[in-house]
Swiss-Prot record:
Its main location: membrane. Residues 1-29 form the signal peptide. The gene is psbU. The keyword Nucleus does not apply. It is a peripheral membrane protein. Disulfide bonds: none annotated. This is Photosystem II extrinsic protein U. PSII is composed of 1 copy each of membrane proteins PsbA, PsbB, PsbC, PsbD, PsbE, PsbF, PsbH, PsbI, PsbJ, PsbK, PsbL, PsbM, PsbT, PsbX, PsbY, Psb30/Ycf12, peripheral proteins PsbO, CyanoQ (PsbQ), PsbU, PsbV and a large number of cofactors. It forms dimeric complexes. Gene3D superfamilies: Photosystem II 12 kDa extrinsic protein. One of the extrinsic, lumenal subunits of photosystem II (PSII). PSII is a light-driven water plastoquinone oxidoreductase, using light energy to abstract electrons from H(2)O, generating a proton gradient subsequently used for ATP formation. The extrinsic proteins stabilize the structure of photosystem II oxygen-evolving complex (OEC), the ion environment of oxygen evolution and protect the OEC against heat-induced inactivation. It is found in: Cellular thylakoid membrane. Belongs to the PsbU family.
Length: 135
């Protein structure tokens, strides 16, 4: 009886695995058809945010690494800015506990920053502190 049960269990498992290999091609919807018939364009949130910031660093959705282009801001001040958000306005950064030197640096580069609404896809976990890009 044990042998029959183990044989049936194995056969059922193999049938399930084979079905899993065969079905995905017919189960998944074609992305072109989804976009065409749903009336919605398939969009990537990250690409939308990059387009919205117009070459500037988004204080609510950028990682610490984006501040490397501004001498003196990376990593200490950049970390404070990233952890201090979200912001409604660029000037809200001045409400953080910044030294006089850091305030001068921020004002020097202020025109290079923008604020857009925080997006969970870009802020989930600790990706803004360590986005996993290594040299």
């Amino acid at each position: 009886m044990k042998r029959l049960l183990s044989w049936l269990t194995g056969a059922l498992l193999m049938a399930g695995l084979l079905a899993g290999l065969i079905l995905p091609g017919s189960v998944h919807a074609d992305e072109d058809l989804v976009g065409k018939y749903s009336g919605n364009e398939i969009r990537n949130i990250a690409d939308d945010k990059i387009a919205a910031r117009e070459g500037k660093v988004d204080l609510n959705n950028s990682s610490v690494r984006r501040f490397q282009q501004f001498p003196g801001m990376y990593p200490t001040m950049a970390g404070k800015i990233v952890l201090g958000g979200p912001y409604n306005d660029v000037d809200e950064v001045l409400n953080l506990d910044l030294s006089e030197r850091q305030i001068e640096l921020f004002n020097k580069y202020k025109e290079n920053f923008t604020v857009t609404p925080p997006e969970i896809a870009l802020n989930e976990g600790d990706d803004r502190i360590n986005d996993g890009q290594y040299r």
